[in-house]
Amino acid sequence: MPFKISRQAYAETYGPTKGDRIRLADTDLILEVEQDHTHYGDEVKFGGGKVIRDGMGQSQQSRDNGVVDTVITNALILDWWGIVKADIGIKDGKISGIGKAGNPDTQEGVNIIVGASTEAIAGEGSIITAGAIDSHIHFICPQQIETALASGVTTMLGGGTGPATGTNATTCTPGAFHISRMLQSAEGFPVNLGFFGKGNATNKAALEEQVRAGACGLKLHEDWGTTPACIDSCLSVADQLDVQVCIHTDTLNEAGFVEDTIKAIRGRTIHTFHTEGAGGGHAPDIIKICGESNVIPSSTNPTRPFTLNTLEEHLDMLMVCHHLDPKIPEDVAFAESRIRRETIAAEDILHDLGAFSIIASDSQAMGRVGEVISRTFQTAHKMKVQRGALPEDNQRNDNHRLKRYISKVTINPAIAHGISAHVGSVEVGKLADLVLWKPGFFGIKPDLVVKGGCIAWAQMGDANASIPTPQPVHGRPMFSSFGKAINPTCLTFLSESAIDAGVPERLKLERSYAPVKDTRKISKQSMKLNDARPKIEVDPQTYEVFANGELLTCEPAELLPLAQRYLLL
């Protein structure tokens, strides 16, 4: 006889199912489960008197016969492709199955076999996302990495050599010597890493040698001189060696205007950093480049979202990061030219329309490395409050908006930088970089961070307590963040030409590594749920932004979710 159970009782036991709705933390964002693959009445769950026991939900099969290393039971997946309830199987550090876990000898529809070799993570009541990708990192200090991991970021791409003056301002690891040292340093960190070389050179040989030394991309930055000639040279090398180019354009318009930069790019694929312009770029109209089909536009998080405090904090940040002197009027004028209320307000709306594709941090260089995910969903919340439901959504849920915004920090930066074969989504075959969130803490404090199939970070109580939960409970690094466990669970991303040249062997790298691929034939249309290409115009006098003739403006937020309610500091 089938047994009927109330939705509330079912959700409390196995987590929410199809049709159930969840409020995300203290935002106004509502998620609704679209599908459930766990089979009612045949769910697996670990614990005393529960299902995953020998001869019941646990099979007699061996690992060699298909048993997974880890099963995450009854997980609610939020990804660009859907919002579904499912079990997740992990084997050899990769996602091996999404669907129904258990024992095929006693249960039907099992595609994830649980056995004696299987560890269990309870996903009931948790939301699972792919580990976030921060594609705008200034590697100023190594402590950034723990802070990023604690927030749910598992991949960091950028440049730098430490707190050098150049690194404080630009995301470049210049030259083979510094690239080699950073690749060797990466061996000790429990996240995926990749480093950008300096792209500011008209001599192509100076750029090629950096890519062949191990750079996974090149960065053009105005502080090194982003001239049309440098842009053309850098993109030519990138096309030859299949790496992405990131650009911070010429705020002062010394070498040309935004139209000249677009002309120099010549339709080639490029990732434009902080495309609104407060972080740097042609003043006042770099934002119009987000309508170009070959441009992948991103934001950095200090302007996410537009608040009462956004403008005030930017001036001092800018002066420090770009080595400017407040006693020099020209330096102050340079800084002030980048900070515009009108373009920052428009940036909010362009994200909601899917015209801006990526959000990153700009870590310690006008951005906060631990706030990529929280700022993303603060923006989503603000836009729901100010603009209402998206046309693709309804009064029951914000599913399309949630999928659009999660894509900005997961799959889209992965595609942009040629690493989507390995990371960026919860899909079979990809590295098991997964973040588990309790709904009340979604976007602000992960419960667990799984890195390459092993727990790298978790909320953990007093180590001297008799159980794991006594206070003080806070995020702490776990076993796979230490020792040689880092090597098989984390990837270092290199150019394919560097791998062919034997860089990992020459530098005696022990970490797993992978090449970046297919960065040059992608376009704005490759961006999941964020491929809108409106025609952008900026009034040169008022700085008002228009998309397809419509004025884009919104008020600054006075109060935000995912903020002081959750944080003591």
Curated annotation (Swiss-Prot):
Please provide, in alphabetical order, the Gene Ontology terms of the cellular component aspect for this entry.
Answer: cytoplasm
Q: Which organism is it from?
A: Prochlorococcus marinus (strain NATL2A)
Listed A to Z, the keywords are: Cytoplasm, Hydrolase, Metal-binding, Nickel
The note describing how and how many cofactors are bound reads:
Binds 2 nickel ions per subunit.
UniProt binding sites for Ni(2+) 1: H136, H138, K219, D362
Q: Which InterPro entries did the record assign?
A: Amidohydro-rel (IPR006680), Metal-dep_hydrolase_composite (IPR011059), Metal_Hydrolase (IPR032466), Urease_alpha_N_dom (IPR011612), Urease_alpha_subunit (IPR050112), Urease_AS (IPR017950), Urease_asu (IPR005848), Urease_asu_c (IPR017951)
- Reactions the enzyme catalyzes: urea + 2 H2O + H(+) = hydrogencarbonate + 2 NH4(+)
Share the record's PTM remark: Carboxylation allows a single lysine to coordinate two nickel ions.
Protein name, as recorded: Urease subunit alpha
Q: Which GO terms describe its biological process?
A: urea catabolic process
Q: Which CDD domains match?
A: Urease_alpha (cd00375)
What gene name does this entry carry?
A: ureC
Q: What class of enzyme is it?
A: hydrolase
Report the superkingdom from the record. Bacteria
Where it sits in the cell: the answer is: Cytoplasm
Where substrate binds, per the record, is at: H221
Task: Report the EC code(s) recorded for this entry.
Answer: 3.5.1.5
Recorded metabolic or biological pathway in which this protein acts: Nitrogen metabolism; urea degradation; CO(2) and NH(3) from urea (urease route): step 1/1
Which molecular function terms from Gene Ontology are attached? Answer: nickel cation binding; urease activity
Cofactor requirements of the protein: Ni cation
Domain Urease stretches: 131-569
Subunit details for this protein?
A: Heterotrimer of UreA (gamma), UreB (beta) and UreC (alpha) subunits. Three heterotrimers associate to form the active enzyme.
